[in-house]
């Protein structure tokens, strides 16, 4: 049996950003080449296909990429560069390799097994690149399974519901202004002033089902000049249809354009739907393993959602207990839960 804890820690040392997971891909390939599987490389990702001479495949998917975050943990397996596996993808890959090890030693299974190592989950394009490759159709995918580590849920337990993660829409706004010396700024278009009003008013659009917020705010380079632009980059997360909050945002932008006689561009085309699980798969999986029903939809986005639009899917959360939150530079967890996580998932890939 391979050591999934060691694998997780090895991968934690070498975090790489989306579509740049070259060393990560090599590490995984060097393990897979010793198994009785066909290895498909897709960009910086891989798919290990274990044939049991069946005409359909069950696919387990994990993600590979890290974040541009400087780790603050003082552990021997700390990141060796300026990136960090602050979202648990190192653990996801370790679990997937544990599954590879199991099915490599199995004589028969109701279906063929595909273990998918997907690049670039954190930035748009990872799951789309897999779907565009048609590899999932080529192996005749019947259904897909995946999971994500999740803080504040009971350590070692699996959780799911019908809509587990919200939709995610990128919001990119630019307010145009006039670049003049502040001594001559009276009656000029002040992009920073307008943008600040837009920021405050847009945050007020959030409610229990919809969230809008901005992580990037950019304006100006000179302290004594009006900025020619004010840029906001953020996201809308919605537990239901985001058209209502999107419509309110567009109305707010139109009002500010008319009031201040300026141009405000708003691009919201980058969109991931919510992660919707197949009800039949939920019910069947609960007959096999202990999965706790979640009472809420979380506002995280997850590009596994593109798979749920095409195939029956089951996506779960693996609780890691009282840890730092995801995407925090101090995120870490008790990785002794990983071997049992592998054992919990195995029956879901053996369903007839």
What are these regions (language model features)?
Residues 46, 67-69, 74-84, 90-91, ...:
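Histidine/acidic-residue-rich, glycine-tolerant segments that coordinate divalent metal ions
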Residues 11, 60, 89, 115, ...:
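Divalent metal-coordination and catalytic microenvironments
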Residues 130, 245-255:
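Short amphipathic alpha-helices in soluble, non-transmembrane regions
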Residues 293-350:
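Zn-dependent metallopeptidase/amidohydrolase metal-coordination segment
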Residues 194, 223-245:
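A conserved active-site cap/scaffold subdomain adjacent to cofactor or substrate pockets
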Residues 47, 213-220, 236-238, 264-283, ...:
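A short beta-alpha structural unit
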Residues 1-85, 94, 101-111:
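Acidic/His- and Gly-rich active-site-bordering loop/insert found
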């Amino acid at each position: 049996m391979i050591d999934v804890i060691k694998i997780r820690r090895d991968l934690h040392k070498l975090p790489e950003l989306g579509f740049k997971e070259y060393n990560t891909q090599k590490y995984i390939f060097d393990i897979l080449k010793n198994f009785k599987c066909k290895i498909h490389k897709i960009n910086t990702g891989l798919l290990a296909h274990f044939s049991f001479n069946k005409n359909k495949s069950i696919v387990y998917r994990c993600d590979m990429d890290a974040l541009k975050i400087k780790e603050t943990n003082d552990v021997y397996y700390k990141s060796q560069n300026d990136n960090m596996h602050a979202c648990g993808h190192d653990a996801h890959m370790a679990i997937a390799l544990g599954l590879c090890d199991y099915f490599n030693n199995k004589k028969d299974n109701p279906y063929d097994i595909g273990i998918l190592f997907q690049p670039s989950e954190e930035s748009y394009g990872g799951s789309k690149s897999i779907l565009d490759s048609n590899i999932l159709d080529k192996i005749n995918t019947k259904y897909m399974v995946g999971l994500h580590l999740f803080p504040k849920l009971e350590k070692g337990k699996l959780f799911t519901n019908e809509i587990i993660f919200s939709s995610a829409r990128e919001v990119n706004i630019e307010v145009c202004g006039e670049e003049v010396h502040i001594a001559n700024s009276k009656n000029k278009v002040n992009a920073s002033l307008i943008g600040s009003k837009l920021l405050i008013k847009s945050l007020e659009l959030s409610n229990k089902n919809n969230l809008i917020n901005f992580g990037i705010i950019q304006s100006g380079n000179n302290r004594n000049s009006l900025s020619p632009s004010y840029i906001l980059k953020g996201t809308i997360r919605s537990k239901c249809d985001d058209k209502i909050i999107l419509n309110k945002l567009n109305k707010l932008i139109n009002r500010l354009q008319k009031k201040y006689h300026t141009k405000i561009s708003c691009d919201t085309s980058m969109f991931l739907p919510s992660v919707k699980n197949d009800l039949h798969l939920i019910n069947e999986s609960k007959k096999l393993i202990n999965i706790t029903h979640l009472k809420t939809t979380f506002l995280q986005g997850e590009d596994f959602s593109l798979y749920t639009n095409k195939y029956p899917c089951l996506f779960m959360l693996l609780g890691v207990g009282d840890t730092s939150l995801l995407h925090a530079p101090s995120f870490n967890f008790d990785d002794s839960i990983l071997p049992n996580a592998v054992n919990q998932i195995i029956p879901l890939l053996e369903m007839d």
